Amino acid sequence: MWRNASMNHSKRNDANDFDSMDEWLRQFFEDPFAWYDETLPIDLYETSQQYIIEADLTFLQPTQVTVTLSGCEFILTVKSSGQTFEKQMMLPFYFNDKNIQVECENQILTVAVNKETEDGSSFSLQFPLS
């Protein structure tokens, strides 16, 4: 008689796994571009003319932070006490043909990227905030 091996094992039914997944999906669909963690909250939103990336640097010094914009990747690097922490975001657009403005005011880093295309070529930019 042919028997499926998986039939011999009881299925694990862990409600906590489902609850965790439900919570993650709920947060993702409410705000799919908010990547929040306790150390470096980053938000991406758009207006009719711009994409805007904001990072809360409340607990950081500008000299600790480096921003890298390359292709469609946004990288925020923090160097503190001999350790490096990096946060990366793949974005739904390329930086190489966009007009970009960056400012850091009241401990909020704002990167505004115009939606309109500029005449451009391959592009990569890295800069410290200080």
Curated annotation (Swiss-Prot):
Induction of the gene: Induced during development under sigma-K control and negatively regulated by GerE.
InterPro entries on file: HSP20-like_chaperone (IPR008978)
Domain of life: Bacteria
Keyword Repeat: no
An annotated GO BP: protein folding
SUPFAM superfamilies named among the record's database cross-references: HSP20-like chaperones (SSF49764)
GO molecular function: unfolded protein binding
Keywords: Sporulation
UniProt function note: Involved in spore outer coat assembly. May be part of a cross-linked insoluble skeleton that surrounds the spore, serves as a matrix for the assembly of additional outer coat material, and confers structural stability to the final structure.
Official protein name in the record: Spore coat protein M
Source organism (scientific name): Bacillus subtilis (strain 168)
Taxonomic lineage of the native organism: Bacteria, Bacillati, Bacillota, Bacilli, Bacillales
